Structure formats: C-alpha cells, structure tokens
Amino acid sequence: MRSPSYPLRTLLALALTAGLTTAVPAAVAATPTAPAAPAAAAPGAPAASAPAQKPYMGWTSWSMQSSKYPGLNPDGDYSYLTEKNVLKQAGALAAKLKKYGYEYVNIDAGWWRDMAWKPEFDGHARQAADPGRFPRGMKPVADDIHAKGLKAGIYLPVGLEKEAYGGGTVPIWNAEGCTTADVVHSDLRTTNGWDSAYKLDFSRPCAQKYIDSQAQMFADWGYDFLKLDGVGPGSFKTGDNYNNVADVAAWQQAIARTGRPIHLEISWSLDINHVADWKKYSNGWRIDTDVECYCNTLVSWENSVDDRFDDAPKWARFAAPGGWNDLDAIDVGNGEMDGLTKAERQSYMTLWAIAKSPLYTGDDLTRLDDYGVSLLTNRDVIAINQGATPPARPVTATGDQQVWSAKNADGSHTVALFNLADTSAAVTADWQSLGFTGQARVRDVWNKEDLGTFRDKVTQALPAHGSRLFTVTPRGAAFQRTAYEAESPSNTLSGNASIGDCGACSGTHKVGNLYQGGKLQFNDVVVKKAGHYMVDVSYISGDARPAKISSNGNGATGLKFPATADWGTVETVTVPVTLKAGANTITIDSGDDFAPDIDRIAVPRL
C-alpha cells in the first residue's frame, strides 16, 4: 500500500503554487557579468574529492520541517527551517557524529520562501535566501558549516518555478539575450512532482545557460551537495512533460563547469526503467516516497519505513561507487520523536546499512537518546554500509520472515534476519541459502559479540518488526547444484502457463503466464538422500509476487518473491522443500494470484 505521505506531498504542492502572482521578479536591465572563477574551499572545509565514492552520511532538515511533533514548527508548516536551527544541528553533528563519518548538513525545501511560502528570487530568476529564515544569506551559512569541517547541502525543485517567470522578461545571468521566455516551452507546459514549475526546453541554448547560472551561484556560495526534487519519470508523474532526464543531464554538465565537486542527488520515487540515466548523470537517486509520516512524530513503521523491504531489492544491483540507491532519511535517534519501537529503529538502521543507502538522519541531533546514539554510531554497522561489500538482497522468498545477505570479499557473509510481522516470530538463516553446509562462525554485529559456531543454520526469535545482523564465516563445505530448466519438455504446464523467450535466462527461455491457476511442475528432480533442501529459484518479476511451492503433491507453502529490476532481469532466491531419495516433483503454483515468471530451479547436491 502506498505511503500516506503522498497526499501531504500534494498539500505541499498547493503551498508551492499558492500566490503565483506574488514576489514575481520584474525585468532587470542588467549587464551580464563574467562567470566567477571556481569557488575556493572555505577554511576548515573538507578536501575536495569525487562525490559519492561511498554512500554519503549526514543530516537533513526535512524530517523536522515536515513533522507536526509539538514545538518543531511553531510558526506554521515547514517553519523549522531557519539559519539558527540549521547551524544548531551542524554544531551537534560536528560534536557527536562527525568522527563516525557523518559530514553533510543538507538544507531542504523552503530556504527561499517565507513562513507563508512566499518566494524570493534574484534579478535573474534564481532562488534567493528568504531574509526571515536566512538573514545573512546562504553563503555565510555554508561558510559556518565548513568551519566545523563539514559539507553544506542545498535544495531545488526541478524546472523554472512559475513565480520566477516574470512574464518571460527576466534576464538570465551571464547569458546575453536570454530571458525566462527563452528557457521554457512556448506553451508554458508544467513539470515536476507538484506541477509547480515550467518545463525547460533544452532544444533552446538559453535553458542550459539558466542551469549553468544556478550551478555557478551554488558553487560561489560554497555548497557541496544539491538535492534536485520532483524529478521524473517518477515523483508519481508520467508522460513527456514529467521526463526530466534532460534536466538532470544539464545539471551534471553545469556542475562540472563550476569546477566544484558538488554531489547531485535526485528525488523522489524515481522510475527504475531510467536507472541508466540516473547512474549516468547523478550521484544518488531516491527509490521511494518520503519516509516521513507528516504526523505527530517524524516517521511511523507503517507509513513507508516498511515499504522499503519490498522496494529496495530490485534496485540493489545498480548501487556502486559514484551512485547509490537512496532510501531516504534514517530517523532513529530519538524514540519519542521518531515514533518507533526500539526493535523498529534497529531494523530501520539495519536495512539502510546493508542496502548501502546513504545514511543521513533527520533527527534533532541535540536530543538524541542513548539508544539512538548507539544505533547511529556503531562502527561495525557503519563499516558494512561504507565498505566494499555489495548491497544485500533477500536470499529467501518467505514473506514477513526474511533473510537478506551479501557475500564479502573474505568469503564471509553479511546476514540480516527480519521479522516484518506484527507479532513475534522465529527467523532462520539456512546455510544452504548461502551456498554451503556444515558449520559456520556467527558474530552479532550490533552487539559486537561472537556467538560461537552453528551447524547448518541459525535461528532467532524476533519481536514484531525486529531484526538481527550477523557476520557468518563458513567453516563447512561448499556444494554444487543441479539445474532444471523451466522450459524442459519433461515438465508439466497447467492452466495458462506457457513457454516464452527470455534473453537473460539461462536457457534463453522461461515459463510465464503463471496466473489464476497456472502451474509449473518440475518432474524427475533427483537427489541422493531424503531431507530438507533450500532450492534456488531463478525468476523474473517486475513487482513482488506470491507463489505456492510444494513437492511430491504434499502441502504447499505460500511464499513471496521480491521484485526484480524489470521483466527482463533474472534474480535468484531459495525456497524450502522436503525431498525424498530418488525422483521428485516440485510445483510452482500461482493459486488465485499472479506469480513470477520462472527461469529454472537448482537443487543442492548434498
């Protein structure tokens, strides 16, 4: 179910588009000046390097801006955002979290708008600091952040904001002959997630020059990070007007021209079908809607924290140095303000860490509780997020009781157990799912405790929404698997099930149309000895889908398969089955639902 934050995003759209006739810049007869030289780093600023070699860490203002927690926004919605509050959080970040790798202080939406959301622009259609929120302007704020050895981040919505258009006569900085009429489409078509801006027309050279002028302004101010929001395809918008790939490309080009290494993060709920574009032109991309609940706390488990368990797997393969899958803020620092149980807070932080998401908190850093500090500063957990280990993915298809894993370069495995159910439950990580049998040494990452040696599996009783995080080091033996192709003529297809082409599949074919009674039965699955087997299922599924798995006509187990990136990408999970010595059947049944397409199964040779 989609997060209830979406209607609140709509309310923000109303705020963004309210009073469109106010604060519109008049045409300014200004002679364009030469572009400034690349901005030098302020004293105390971290050394420049290529952005996003690791998932970034820091703080964002939006979680507190968007919350109705008592006292956070005393002057109306989103009023938390002020120079005083930003610098207070920067001071707390430097004192408490900087030594653990947190370094970005990111100013989100509204820095150019007053408490009634009336905007400020300079004489060149660029956002300007609201004097009530940021009386000294934005450069002194960045300078103060740099003086603490931190990096400064800022925010913009994509497109030319409607209020900045000024009848089309506003001159573009350092672009002789260009006005706002020359940067947009002549029909003033709108764009972004709120339709609060006119879409830029990059077939017109002035559009790139407008982006260049904004990027140079941020570089001159000393900003190190830009969040570009409302980007599509995504942000709950589709169609040509909301395709902002050209905007993101223009921003990448403009940032490069400034000579300043500015991290470009794009948002929100971006379309995975354009992931190649996001990777090419940006350093990070929000894969989902806001994590905030827009309620009396910062977040809630059901709002959208739990959505990430469904949405993150299909993006995992795309994360790499230079660009990361952004799951949004980690609001785990103060239980009362966050609105989560301790178990939920640990699961939240665990998923973000193993998924290699940027780690940026939206909490009030001056009010962190002891448990929140322990979550945000656990060096072993941070090392998983910041190290060379690839993002973890689910290795089992088991619904609310999930096992995620990533194999480390030293042969060990990062393994997370999650119970997403509303009641307590046991969760088991079976070594077969990790590719070996026998013994393994298990270390509890959160508690920094060696738990000893476990044979074949580890099982933990977890509370509702609880988790455990382990490093599992095999001491047993690896094994081979015997593969059985779905399209084999020895199999039995029932209902609508049919064989289709699949270029990514192992045999270039798959079995699909497994819906509403469609079944695929693998025949003559041979094992030497009877017992419990974790069978690999390679499948294709553009969204998370259920299926029922059974062997030899026995009772079926209902399972849920995580989404793959699209309907052309193959992923693999393991499913538990009981087999007898000799020949067996394994059946994948859609039941009354829609199941994934199947490439093949692979059975351990034990």
Task: Tell what function each PLM region has.
Residues K356-A421, N496-T508, G512-N513, N523:
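Glycan-recognition and catalytic regions of carbohydrate-active enzymes
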Residues M64-N73, L81, Q89-D144, K148-T238:
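Aromatic-lined carbohydrate-binding/catalytic grooves of carbohydrate-active enzymes
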Residues D182-R189, A197, D201-S203, S213, ...:
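Glycan-recognition surfaces
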Residues A425, L434-V442, D450, D456-L606:
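Extracytoplasmic
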Residues M1-A36, A40:
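Secretory targeting and sorting signals
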Residues Q346, W352-A355, Y360-G362, A397-F436, ...:
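Carbohydrate-binding surface patches
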Residues A39-E83, I266:
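N-terminal module-boundary/linker segments of secreted carbohydrate-active enzymes
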Residues L150-Y165, Q252, A256-N273:
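Aromatic-lined carbohydrate-recognition surfaces of secreted/lumenal glycan-active proteins
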